[in-house]
Amino acid sequence: MEAEKKMVLPRIKFTEHKTNTTTIVSELTNTHQTRILRISVTDPDATDSSSDDEEEEHQRFVSKRRRVKKFVNEVYLDSGAVVTGSCGQMESKKRQKRAVKSESTVSPVVSATTTTTGEKKFRGVRQRPWGKWAAEIRDPLKRVRLWLGTYNTAEEAAMVYDNAAIQLRGPDALTNFSVTPTTATEKKAPPPSPVKKKKKKNNKSKKSVTASSSISRSSSNDCLCSPVSVLRSPFAVDEFSGISSSPVAAVVVKEEPSMTTVSETFSDFSAPLFSDDDVFDFRSSVVPDYLGGDLFGEDLFTADMCTDMNFGFDFGSGLSSWHMEDHFQDIGDLFGSDPLLAV
């Protein structure tokens, strides 16, 4: 029985074959929709080739698989140009819808890329949702984020960040705007005003030194010329004039107190200023050269010298007419002061 059931109920293979055709009908000009005419035929005992009945029966029982074919023929009834125009409109509408969908999906991406790529990004600067630009920096020592404030533009916030970075991390810090070496040197260079003040102070000290040295020279010249004016010695005047002119060329200005330079000017006069021979030497113009020895030597008062000597004091040429007391009294009058002038 089981064998018979298997032979009666074999397996079935179903296939469908479809064909599409279009035809133009003039009667459908008023309608804008296309009509479809579908024709279908099913062959339950389909074979690949034709044969006798016996062979078919034999194959039906012998074959393990049954084959069924379905043929479908679809005919599209169109109304010519109207139908084609409507189809073109439908296709154009579909294309427009597709284009709108593609634009709606692509446009936000494009706008986002333009906003992000069009604007320049700065270090330590971020934009708030309401449009302001915030600047902040991290302190490497405290390990804390420092708030620098909000600004209207990104450039202002970037400049504030650069200043804070230079203060915290030095001139080698990473900044948004590159710093040229000229500006760096200008920032590091000291201000010129203190130098000018120092120069002015040095000039003032030099002027004070030269003034003090000139005053000291004038006072020294006055002190040196006072005995010459009293004794009326031309040799002494020439000597002191040469001395007063020579130290002027030898003065060296130094940035030291004025007392040191004054002491240096007086260092040339370490030797005694006046000797007995220079002060009381009357060989220049007053006393003739034939005295030969010292002014107050032993040969001064010899008999030969006294006979021929005459000083212009109307004493006479002889030794008897020369009174020693009267002569020295006149010398004392030279060093004294007139009583009338003193009053």
Swiss-Prot record:
Q: Which residues bind DNA?
A: 121-178
List the SUPFAM superfamilies: DNA-binding domain
Q: Extract the ranges annotated as region (Disordered).
A: 40-60, 180-223
Basic residues bias: start-end ranges:
195-207
Cell location: Cytoplasm; Nucleus
Q: Which GO terms describe its cellular component?
A: cytoplasm; nucleus
Protein's GO biological process = cotyledon development; cytokinin-activated signaling pathway; ethylene-activated signaling pathway; root development
Q: Where does the UniProt entry say this protein principally localizes? A: cytoplasm
Where in the sequence does UniProt note compositional bias of the Low complexity kind?
208-220
Q: Which UniProt keywords apply?
A: Activator, Cytokinin signaling pathway, Cytoplasm, DNA-binding, Ethylene signaling pathway, Nucleus, Transcription, Transcription regulation
UniProt-listed InterPro entries: AP2/ERF_dom, AP2/ERF_dom_sf, AP2/ERF_ERF_subfamily, DNA-bd_dom_sf
Specify the domain of life of the species encoding this protein: Eukaryota
Chaperone as a keyword? no
- What is this protein's expression induced by? By cytokinins.
Molecular-function GO terms, alphabetical: DNA-binding transcription factor activity; identical protein binding; transcription cis-regulatory region binding
Q: Does the keyword Membrane apply?
A: no
Function, as annotated, reads: Component of the cytokinin signaling pathway involved in cotyledons, leaves, and embryos development. Probably acts as a transcriptional activator. Binds to the GCC-box pathogenesis-related promoter element. May be involved in the regulation of gene expression by stress factors and by components of stress signal transduction pathways.
Please report which protein family the annotation says this sequence is part of: Belongs to the AP2/ERF transcription factor family. ERF subfamily.
What's the protein name?
A: Ethylene-responsive transcription factor CRF2
Q: What organism does this protein naturally occur in?
A: Arabidopsis thaliana (Mouse-ear cress)
Q: Which gene is the coding source of this polypeptide chain? A: CRF2
